[in-house]
Amino acid sequence: MQSFREQSSYHGNQQSYPQEVHGSSRLEEFSPRQAQMFQNFGGTGGSSGSSGSGSGGGRRGAAAAAAAMASETSGHQGYQGFRKEAGDFYYMAGNKDPVTTGTPQPPQRRPSGPVQSYGPPQGSSFGNQYGSEGHVGQFQAQHSGLGGVSHYQQDYTGPFSPGSAQYQQQASSQQQQQQVQQLRQQLYQSHQPLPQATGQPASSSSHLQPMQRPSTLPSSAAGYQLRVGQFGQHYQSSASSSSSSSFPSPQRFSQSGQSYDGSYNVNAGSQYEGHNVGSNAQAYGTQSNYSYQPQSMKNFEQAKIPQGTQQGQQQQQPQQQQHPSQHVMQYTNAATKLPLQSQVGQYNQPEVPVRSPMQFHQNFSPISNPSPAASVVQSPSCSSTPSPLMQTGENLQCGQGSVPMGSRNRILQLMPQLSPTPSMMPSPNSHAAGFKGFGLEGVPEKRLTDPGLSSLSALSTQVANLPNTVQHMLLSDALTPQKKTSKRPSSSKKADSCTNSEGSSQPEEQLKSPMAESLDGGCSSSSEDQGERVRQLSGQSTSSDTTYKGGASEKAGSSPAQGAQNEPPRLNASPAAREEATSPGAKDMPLSSDGNPKVNEKTVGVIVSREAMTGRVEKPGGQDKGSQEDDPAATQRPPSNGGAKETSHASLPQPEPPGGGGSKGNKNGDNNSNHNGEGNGQSGHSAAGPGFTSRTEPSKSPGSLRYSYKDSFGSAVPRNVSGFPQYPTGQEKGDFTGHGERKGRNEKFPSLLQEVLQGYHHHPDRRYSRSTQEHQGMAGSLEGTTRPNVLVSQTNELASRGLLNKSIGSLLENPHWGPWERKSSSTAPEMKQINLTDYPIPRKFEIEPQSSAHEPGGSLSERRSVICDISPLRQIVRDPGAHSLGHMSADTRIGRNDRLNPTLSQSVILPGGLVSMETKLKSQSGQIKEEDFEQSKSQASFNNKKSGDHCHPPSIKHESYRGNASPGAATHDSLSDYGPQDSRPTPMRRVPGRVGGREGMRGRSPSQYHDFAEKLKMSPGRSRGPGGDPHHMNPHMTFSERANRSSLHTPFSPNSETLASAYHANTRAHAYGDPNAGLNSQLHYKRQMYQQQPEEYKDWSSGSAQGVIAAAQHRQEGPRKSPRQQQFLDRVRSPLKNDKDGMMYGPPVGTYHDPSAQEAGRCLMSSDGLPNKGMELKHGSQKLQESCWDLSRQTSPAKSSGPPGMSSQKRYGPPHETDGHGLAEATQSSKPGSVMLRLPGQEDHSSQNPLIMRRRVRSFISPIPSKRQSQDVKNSSTEDKGRLLHSSKEGADKAFNSYAHLSHSQDIKSIPKRDSSKDLPSPDSRNCPAVTLTSPAKTKILPPRKGRGLKLEAIVQKITSPNIRRSASSNSAEAGGDTVTLDDILSLKSGPPEGGSVAVQDADIEKRKGEVASDLVSPANQELHVEKPLPRSSEEWRGSVDDKVKTETHAETVTAGKEPPGAMTSTTSQKPGSNQGRPDGSLGGTAPLIFPDSKNVPPVGILAPEANPKAEEKENDTVTISPKQEGFPPKGYFPSGKKKGRPIGSVNKQKKQQQPPPPPPQPPQIPEGSADGEPKPKKQRQRRERRKPGAQPRKRKTKQAVPIVEPQEPEIKLKYATQPLDKTDAKNKSFYPYIHVVNKCELGAVCTIINAEEEEQTKLVRGRKGQRSLTPPPSSTESKALPASSFMLQGPVVTESSVMGHLVCCLCGKWASYRNMGDLFGPFYPQDYAATLPKNPPPKRATEMQSKVKVRHKSASNGSKTDTEEEEEQQQQQKEQRSLAAHPRFKRRHRSEDCGGGPRSLSRGLPCKKAATEGSSEKTVLDSKPSVPTTSEGGPELELQIPELPLDSNEFWVHEGCILWANGIYLVCGRLYGLQEALEIAREMKCSHCQEAGATLGCYNKGCSFRYHYPCAIDADCLLHEENFSVRCPKHKPPLPCPLPPLQNKTAKGSLSTEQSERG
């Protein structure tokens, strides 16, 4: 983000307007935050970067910047307007034309359109990115051309905004063409500065677009006219897109890609359909074949045919190189949009070098914009950067590597923007940019990269792509042969050289220059990764696939893709959701950037081009869902065509798209299958093809798939997924996204992903059905088939994912994920799914894919990730690995798919605001998993794929290398990724926000790690630990299947463990650790700012969750100051998200890697220990570099592969310890991966960052907010976990169980050490890991022990929570390493995945709380907290912990759920101890945690708090969880009762039953049980049973906790909030709730009921102790003497009376609300008289009461002064009635502040009650004293206002303050004692101020005769000392500073009461 920010800064204007574009929708939600964040970061540029990168949130800020920029460039206004347009949606884009109507503005609107649309879609992820990037002007023109790409707007635009953007662009294009020409010329003339500044996006876009537009309009007059015609469609599309995600992006992108989109739309439209098809096919082909694209582009430019694009691209590349500095952005755009570039190349270079709108437009236009659009779209996305980068590819990439670095970064940014745009929609692209909110990362990354930000973007992208670049580089170097082989054969043309060059040179270049890396990694990730990787993976296939998909998909998908990208699922599948995502989401969806940005990102990167293609391909075929299936096939078909084949195929399919969507889809499917066969060799092919396609498709698929929900999803996802991986990415993503996402994620995630990617969604369905069905059978063919076939991919990928476990896990997990995520993202489920998922994956891929097969896929992934957020960087890491692995093998692919799914999910989580939170949690979890998968996969699978699935050592080395170097080079790249990524992702990820940071960073490593960890957590989140790497790899293993698993484990043992562990540790450290978490945190913050909470990118989705999250995020925003803190927050937030994601992912991961992964993991652990070591060392050192917290931990990375896991585990182990899961996980995991994985999500922040960061965050961030955030995140994570686990619990957990046991064995081997490690979390973590390293033998030994009997044993133990807890404790203590580990593993596996995450989250919260409470303040404490608290936890958990847990749970629930500061604080206080209990108790308390999680999560924004608890309860049913997940999506719901009432209850219940918590953990375990078959039901039952018991204990807890944590009571009281009405009547029934309403900016109005009815009743029934009531004092009250004075009871309001009087206070004679004294409480009747009153108050009274209650509550809350006052008062009065003291004390806190004080007695509380219960809103004075008000100050005048009401002569009304300050008045059990006496005395007392009778306050000074009414005392300026309710007249007032001298204070109570008594 910083990078982006800087980029943003660089492109402030550009980014600015993108922000605006973005801001409108998602950015509107995001924008404020993002704008703030980005503005914070980029200032104007930051805003711009915000716009681009953080377009979502920053967009608005960027809008401001854009406004500034707008002035800078007319276009910027357009941008701003456009931003709003893009933000406002597609239609706005069209409107924007007018809006942007400034001469430059219309041009800018889409030149601006491209730039603005682009730029705004920088906002649109593409345009702005392009604007940001190279020269958005040129490339935004190209963006316009690439609009198609960039937008998969063309995708989106195709469906919604195929023309949407184009239409806009058309209309806009015409306007803009003229204006854009002006603008472009203008901008182009001022191109460098302007484009870079405002003009870069604008200029580039404007310039290009005029060129494009003029060209397109003139050249492609038909097309452009079509575009214009389509512009109408654009508006339709806009509407559609508006509905869908498309609207923002298409608009943004439409403008940006209007030429293209026009063309594209034309593509979508019939005219361009054919034309675009041809062109696009070529363009896409070119894009697909990066070689082709330049040619195609060039030719297109020249011949306006796809070939021209290639040449053009080549030309462009040179030109880009020529223009690099000038066009660095532009060329980045060029690179980003090869078509754009090509056009830019020609446009820029030869023909109109960017200045000739005609030329450029012609270039686009000739291609009919579809082609260039496709080309551009794909080129930018997949081909643009890769096209330029790949085509001239290497030229461009290399060239871009140098200049294009910025250019390429821009391209990457643009591409990701493109990708996101397509993915999201063009608009989502905008959103990708905005969503780049997530887009912030991706787009700002891309965008910011534009000019100078190019560097930043490059850095950001580099950070995002560093892994990619490093991966790419390493991969290029290591995999260069593979890449070249894969790429070259596949992309024999330029893809070969480009890919190789790009892969080799460019990655190196990129590595050389962060920018280059970013460009290559980011851009290249987008282009290189997408194109290059696709090509590398797919060979040219990727390119061709991309092209094909871009062309065909983009074309066909142009509409659908646009819709898809706009999230046709959103539109189609979930138009509402998508619209939610799209409308608000597409633009906002980026906000909700879950799916959107994901797609955005994905789309942005390759998704744009690939998805543009895929989307388009899919759009043609994917327009229909059936078509989508075809499209997936089509998407994958190009891959199967083979690189060249696909290239030509792309050309063909591109022409096909109109009708070839299905054909394409089928071809893709066929080719995919065939090509997939080639696929692995041409894995990149398949992946690249599908990857490209997938990438394109996701862009498109999101559009297309969104449009054609299923098929497109499958296609899009697979394309995105398959394409994403560019086969690894595309494959994994295609597979993973398509399959994994479809399968694992989509099942869980289909809705979300489908909606997000529609392709994804499509695939989720497929995943659900097909994946599951074809799953096993296709496992073998999955690699070949799945990858090639997106649809098949889904199925095959499922098969590949193969492992049924994985598949099932994916299915189970993902299905729930999908639905859940979808639900989570329900607001913008698709958006969530697609964008985030897509993005994280692409990003991840981009990060990792650069490494390997994933590189192409990675491109996608990365692109997605990039777009999604910089998080996608992490995501890319994750994704790439997954994709690479996925690419490598079916299993790998499956794993990768799973990963992708998780990534998708994660991405989903990432981008979707609230949805994002969910999705992000998922997505991030998924991303981590996916990243892990992808990294693992990429590392293992990719290398395996390329090297052979079984070449693990090489693979490992490669993978390690690549994982390390490329994906983060496992360790290196992880670190590199994190180091740079951290550095950059910090900016980058910050851009996207937490999602970004987390996803990007963690997404990269952490994400992957988290994914793994989450998966580990999720499924045996633990079980993944031992092979934490194996497990981490397990998913990968599953990806790689056995061989790959072996490989995977081998690589991932080293890589998995080092990568997963170290990587994850690193990632963790990063993900949760500083850079990532920081990024995430910061990014999240920024995102949160614009996205609400990155944590809950649901901001986006849900306001409530947003509020909470926003609060949390705002909290985190504070820490955002420090990257680490941010990371910590991110970790806290992200971990939760990640955890949730991870949990979600966990099962799939566990599932896949369960079977083979365990063995492989073990073997790998043993065999790969050294590689792991090396990697771990790398990781360790890098981690150390990256994260401070991880330093000590990271020192051990080299120690062992286990240690890495342990390091990671340590990292999060200590946090986990804090979490209890961490402990369990750490203990359990020795399976470093598992713990790491599990912890990454949860404890990464805990340990690495968490320890430090959390601590710091807590310090920096408000403890409560941190807690809450942690809790929210955790809860979300837990919920996700629960959901995912539940969904995948059965299948995945079974696999996981086995795997978990294996893992456990492995982990257990490490566990004792890890326990030690945990004990010595920071330093020893590594040491333990070293031991763990040593424990490979141990691992093998332990596995049988733990692996074998562990399941049942663990189940039993889990069932018997004490065992688990104790085991966990022992484990933590290293006492029962095996048993404990088993228990821990199972508990953590079950619990941590479900509750574990929650536990971790709770622990996190606890940690935060503890740290805040300074219980866990010290890192050692945290770590020790894990160790100590864990053992202590076990014991405490059962004993005091039970209460503490209850309290903690309650507090946590309250904190997360209610999040009342008090509750949080109380929770914090409680939590530390409780947490200590919880870390271990986390296992036991997992269920409670889960429930708190669920409940908290609901508040957190996990919609299905209850659902989750239910899901956890009903863990036996995946469906149950799935529904729960679906329930979850309504995160918005969370604020409601669940958060308060149910969550607490459930949490407390479960917490109370620490043992029940294990059952909740059992949901994860249930899958294990499921594996066993029987245990699961038992667990469920037990869990439910436990929950039930928990419910009972909860009450006890409430009682016990009542004193400890009052916040709990409010929830309890909430039940009675409405009861007072009826009860006020009867003495016993007269319950006066004292409600304290505090307006929390974070939470909104927080209502705290101070006194529960029970309390009152118990007091009345003295037999009962009042302890039940909140305060123990009631019991004391009972035991102690009550006031001897008579008491009054509140009675019904008199509705009929012969006496009419003024309703005034009986003490002061003033009316209600007099001087802000609040409402009057009453009516109170003398006890004798009250008995005569009717028991049932008249209805009027009830209404009055209600109204009064409302008013009073406010008054009370506002007026509630200090508890101390009341406490003092109570203490003072306790003499008279001690029991009252406590009661009033609680009420006292609610005492009205206005009153400044109240009667000294507790009556203050009572008045509140009175007011609440009785409440005539009219002024109240005692009946008998109606005249008092008249004489009161202002009496006559005011008195006139006092209504005359029928009053009873015996009814008394009082002000809270008057009663509080009156002497001897007490409120006990609803009875007001002493009022009559006080009144009698007062009647004789004359006020010294107003001279009226009724004075109740006397000066405290002896001998002073001044008496006052309470209000008069205030008026007289008396000193009212609330501590003892003493009054000092003005004469005796002490000096101002000292209200009451200490002496007086001491005597105040006694003296005061004495004095008062005397007075009385």
From Swiss-Prot:
It comes from Homo sapiens (Human). One of its GO terms (molecular function) is zinc ion binding. A motif (Nuclear localization signal) lies at residues 1254-1268, 1576-1600, 1785-1792. There is a cross-link at K929 (Glycyl lysine isopeptide (Lys-Gly) (interchain with G-Cter in SUMO1)). GO terms for biological process: positive regulation of transcription by RNA polymerase II; regulation of transcription by RNA polymerase II. The lineage of its organism: Eukaryota, Metazoa, Chordata, Craniata, Vertebrata. It comes from the Eukaryota. Residues 61-75, 164-192, 236-259, 306-322, 368-388, 665-677 have a biased composition (Low complexity). Keywords: Acetylation, Activator, Disease variant, DNA-binding, Intellectual disability, Isopeptide bond, Metal-binding, Methylation, Nucleus, Phosphoprotein, Transcription, Transcription regulation, Ubl conjugation, Zinc, Zinc-finger. Residues 1555-1566 have a biased composition (Pro residues). GO terms for cellular component: nuclear body; nucleoplasm; nucleus. The gene is TCF20. A zinc finger (C2HC pre-PHD-type) spans 1829-1865. This is Transcription factor 20. The atypical PHD domain functions as a negative modulator of cofactor binding.
